[in-house]
Amino acid sequence: MIQNLQRKDSQWTPFILPDLISIQRDSFLLFLERGLATELSHVTPLTGSHFRITLCSHGYRLKRPKVSIQEAVYQATSYSAALYVNVETNQSNLGTQETQIQSVWMGDIPLMTSRGHFIINGSSRVVVNQIVRSPGIYFKEMIDQKHRRMFQASIISNRGSWVRLETDVDGMIWVRMDKAKKISILIVLEAMGLSKKTIFRSLKSPEFLFKALQQLLAKKRWQDKVYELIPQSTTDALFHLYTKLSPDKPGNTLTARRVLYEKLMDAKRYDVGLVGRVKLNKKLKLPVPEHVHTLRPVDFLAATDYLIGLEYGRGQVDDIDHLKNRRVRCAGELIQSQLRIGLNRLERTMQGRISRPGELPGMSSLMNPKPVMAALREFFGSNPLSQFMDQTNPLAELTHKRRLSSLGPGGLSQDRAGMAVREIHPSQYGRICPIETPEGPNAGLIGSMATYARLNQYGGLECPFYQVVEGKVLYEFGPIFLTAEQEDQVTVVAGDILDQRKLMVAVAEGRDPLDPAVRPTLPDRPLILRSRQEFHTGSFRDVNYVGIAPTQMISVATSLIPFLEHDDANRALMGSNMQRQAVPLLKTEAPIIGTGLEAQVAADAGGVVQSPFEGIVVYVDATRIVVSTSKSKLALSKKRKIHESNVFLQVYQRSNQGTCIHQRPIIPLHTPVIRGDLLADGSSTSGGQIALGKNLLVAYMPWEGYNFEDAILISERLIYDDLYTSLHIERYEVETQHTKLGPEEITKSIVHETDDKLPYRWLDERGIVMRGAWVEPGDVLIGKITPKEEKELTPELRLVYAIFGKRPKGFRDTSLRVPQGVRGRVVDVRMIRDEDTKVVHVYVCQQRQIQVGDKMAGRHGNKGIVSRIVPRQDMPYLQDGTPVDMVLNPLGVPSRMNVGQVFECLLGLAGQRLGQQLKVRAFDEMYGAEASRHLVYNKLHEASEVTGHHWLFDPNHPGKSRLIDGRTGDMFDQAVTIGQAYMLKLIHQVDDKIHARATGPYSLITQQPLGGRSKRGGQRLGEMEVWAFEGFGAAYTLQELLTVKSDDMQGRNEIMSAMVQGRQLPEMGTPESFKVMIRELQALCLDIGIYHRSKMTFKTEEIDLMQMR
């Protein structure tokens, strides 16, 4: 009913949303175009007595991948391109110079797909953007225990030693490098080549250092160590610096100079990068060229001057959590840094090979790509920033690609991150979402980019604003993107103060939206302005910039929540996170109450299929759509040819999380299309919009206690109409191997006369299950035999086999069977052949209906577990006879403060009755106080008038209605809030969680049952549970749990046989964990044993642990 309804807008934003995954694609493109060349240019040429080998940074090429993206997934390989680099060899032989250029294979570079992820070993992976401290110099103030003030300057680099300048209580400035002892700034500066005269003349306040030196020299302990403060010469300074940096190694002036150069001035070992140099120059007002990425003496001199200025009250300390001091490292930059590691390893390998005596080895053996490939494989396989892509639904995929993580190499760790790093900083407005972050130890460390945010060339986050002049918003100049630092210098106002009603009317009537008469202006009343991270009140004349949209401060997932401003932030966080956990349903349905971003999220996440160009649809089936267009053959001729493009659809494919990826065509044949038109819907979209759940008729009321504590009561209509039925595809794999007794074999010839043939019924002649077969638990998916060792036969058996012509079984059946609890249809079978092995993948699709124990949630953090499924005739029903689909607990609203769900369900009811879909964007108070309430009441009143059902809007209790009990036919005593809510079914399903254990595996050391469903484990009886048994005096039950049900090895075997044979249960023995504890104490050289004292002789005898019962 809702599918073809009209979507009505309640707001209009002139600025179109950017491509939401461009951050991934742009970064990788930059790596291919510039990053590769940069890293190749940093490889040092190899020189010998008569040759020179150079890697050319230009002319490299990438070959087209051998397999397509889909084939890479099926064959469990990586989607990558071979990198070929030109290598120039200059050889001098008997006075002649020979130059040869060869194209050498340098390994395979994984390629990013058009959707912004990688295919590594058949699995989709995402490289998460890392937000780190930007390279540069940072000043901070420190207070010691005696409340004395000191200052510190930290120089952060991309690569190399960390350097810190700090003042002490006497005012002296010291330098620390890595873990070396502190060194006087005068020694460092003079060792770098500056004279004392230059140093003191360059400082604005040299008297500060003079005074500090006088105070130190007045102290006894420094009178004999003057050389540690003031060097006599440059040589003296170099030698003293070397003794501090390498105290255990003897050296001379030349060695000291080399160590200093390698520490701070060697571009291969120390690098502040372009961003670091720009920040150093800006902070210290230096004229150093931007291509110089190492430290210079002038950097130390200017940092010293700034530190002295801080002591005199000049300058400012830095806020390290401000976004101007942080930058984002995207996929391309992270891969580039890993490629650098691989090239450095290759360089060392090549140096080692050419240093051997003999002829110059061949180029293919010299340029072995293994170090480069190993480095990339290590990054994609084990780096915490390379993650298994969340493919539960398109929104989860999109959010994963826009994630910002402070963790990973070069970042923070969960243990060391304090509250200051995790908290919301004012500079994050419009750049990082203040709501969407995980719950738990990663809270605040992992975030999500705001909807309109983008990255600049330095990795800084920028936010768009419209410029304002004298209260007029300059739309015609488009949005201006500001960094956090630039935003601090101007006065801005939020985008939710613009009244856009005139603009919407003009757009609806087809008039120019930039007409001064209709475009929004700032209101002539006191406004809440923001400048330098502080709020204050002012007039529209003080405003420099205005936000482009009310939702620009939040992320994509959060902006999909209607009436967000009426929800508590904690519940909005849960709602944002749980939308990503929604399972794609068999029958999709777009929400009645949306926010307007549903279509763009579906398109940018790759959830729908769009036309690649303008043309006409000439062929449609379940697997492909053909779009035909005409292209001119020659520019000057009139001849034209037809160009056809095949758009292939994904059909019943498995996602990383086991959900079903399926695209179905919705475009009719012979339909003209333009570029970007919708051709096919995905498994989580409806009509091109993201559709993660269903619109249900809900009632907020208690029902026999079945919705106590967030439990959810549902109607059986949800099952019979397949409203929440979802498809889940599981992949089962078999690999044949060569054993020492012979090769394993996939075959159908396993069944013997005495065997049950039923489980083998679906195998084809190859021994692999047929596609389309319906399989049950225990059915054989792949028939496989493994050779086993034959026993020596007796003469009698040999005679029997000779008479009847039978041979003994020389193999055992190791077939792959359907596990317990799984039944479904085989949707695909794939075979991958290698030189020695054969791998077969079987994909089984399960259809899961909603059941008791499944988790459901709304978009406002209102989550719960299905507790009971009630016949539809027993559910409460409306006054027109419509039974309610779901009953929720009304006590779940007031304390959680997520009132947005009430607004949503009431407006949804009005929209459903009027046949409308409504787009309601957040922060609508610009239209007046209580704007949401007025909108809801107006729509409910309109619905009651249009339909004639006046009970939809009762002025005595608006938003509520009298319900009738389906069991008795009596009307409930009080009016109940009813409405259409958009409810999601989450991936936390009872089928994946329910588990029971009778007997199973035990730990090898403690002999106690393992834990967890995957290991067929049991439930742990912990310390507090033991106390509970003790408190109730249940001694025998406790003894049984701690012994035969746990780690009394002999006892558990005896008790099982006793129960089977009906004998009396034996006595309990000693737990194995007790023996382990005694052995561990003995391993600590403690003489501890177990002794028995005889009652008759009173003699004490030691009991052997191994013989102990």
Curated annotation (Swiss-Prot):
Tell me the Gene3D superfamilies matching this sequence. 2.40.50.100, 2.40.50.150, 3.90.1100.10, DNA-directed RNA polymerase, beta subunit, external 1 domain, DNA-directed RNA polymerase, subunit 2, domain 6, RNA polymerase alpha subunit dimerisation domain, RNA polymerase Rpb2, domain 2
Key word Plastid present in the record? yes
Kindly indicate whether the keyword Flavoprotein belongs to this entry.
Answer: no
Q: Name one GO biological process term.
A: DNA-templated transcription
> Catalyses which reaction?
RNA(n) + a ribonucleoside 5'-triphosphate = RNA(n+1) + diphosphate
EC code? 2.7.7.6
Q: Which GO terms describe its molecular function?
A: DNA binding; DNA-directed RNA polymerase activity; ribonucleoside binding
Checking InterPro entries in the record gives: DNA-dir_RNA_pol_bsu_ext_1_sf, DNA-dir_RNA_pol_su2, DNA-dir_RNAP_su2_dom, DNA-dir_RNAP_su2_hyb_sf, RNA_pol_bsu_bac, RNA_pol_bsu_CS, RNA_pol_bsu_protrusion, RNA_pol_Rpb2_2
Q: Where in the cell is it found?
A: Plastid, Chloroplast
* Principal location listed in the UniProt entry: plastid
- Assigned GO CC terms: chloroplast; DNA-directed RNA polymerase complex; mitochondrion
Question: Mind listing the UniProt keywords for this protein, alphabetically?
Answer: Chloroplast, DNA-directed RNA polymerase, Nucleotidyltransferase, Plastid, Transcription, Transferase
Q: Which residues form a coiled coil?
A: none
Pfam families tied to this protein: RNA_pol_Rpb2_1, RNA_pol_Rpb2_2, RNA_pol_Rpb2_3, RNA_pol_Rpb2_6, RNA_pol_Rpb2_7
EC main class here is transferase
User: Which family is this protein grouped under?
Assistant: Belongs to the RNA polymerase beta chain family.
**What does the UniProt record say this protein does?**
DNA-dependent RNA polymerase catalyzes the transcription of DNA into RNA using the four ribonucleoside triphosphates as substrates.
Q: Describe its assembly.
A: In plastids the minimal PEP RNA polymerase catalytic core is composed of four subunits: alpha, beta, beta', and beta''. When a (nuclear-encoded) sigma factor is associated with the core the holoenzyme is formed, which can initiate transcription.
Task: Write the protein's name.
Answer: DNA-directed RNA polymerase subunit beta
Record organism: Nephroselmis olivacea (Green alga)
